[in-house]
Amino acid sequence: MTLNFRLLSGHLGAEILDFDPRDEFNETLTAELRLALQAHHVLLFRGKPLGEEQQVRLTQIAGVLTYRGYGNYTDPDQKSSLVSNAHEGGLFGDGELSFHSDLSFTPHILKARSLHALILPTYSEAGGETLFSDVQAAYDELAPQLKAAVEPLQARFCATYDFGDRSEVVEFVRPLIGTHPQTGRRFIAASRAVTKEVIGMERAEYRPLLKALWAHIEQPQYIYRHRWQIADTLLWDNIAVQHARTPFDPKEKRALRAVSVDDPAIAVTPTQPSEAVA
């Protein structure tokens, strides 16, 4: 089988057509899907209701199932988490989320992630859209003067976990410009959500640089804006792109199931500590 797809935007995104992720697929098709993900960074599978195991199988074309990061994985059978304001214990329930790559505030940025739409706001203009930015293309087209200024710089990436009875700050120092471990392409790691300061510089010096990078990656030519439909699944390369969420009416219910994968050397099991919450 040769995959058919429809491009979603100029720089990134492809809807996979004539393929049902609920069906069994062989190594040849798995390899095609991996190549499509490498080429387009974000893959859309539209209108196919997936159970957890089916979503896990699809996401694992990009890596090994991991329990690193969001959620308290105490059940060995738990393979996903919920981004939801409709379920007790749901993560990041509502409100706007600025551009970021998941777990960029830890030693290893998460390799890939999928989201599957379970519950959505009842009217189309309610918000809650997911935006993706091609931070590799954005790096390629960065102004030479700005590129030279930020190439050698390292920054503090930081996030706060709220565990209900306590909060915990997790942070890591990494370069503003990274190299994709699989493809070798350079990408802009700086994100509005979690990049807090540049090491060795005063705020008056680094804020203009960070603002310039943020504004650059958020330009329309680098963005794919996804308007969710029930049973949509998005799978993305979490290093090649950053993502964000538009705000939505908190009275509206929204729930997406998330599955995360890593390289085998990075992935952790439910019995291992997660570096993001340790």
Features from the language model and the residues they span:
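Non-heme Fe(II) oxygenase catalytic core, chiefly the N-lobe of the double-stranded beta-helix
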Residues: 2-233, 239-278
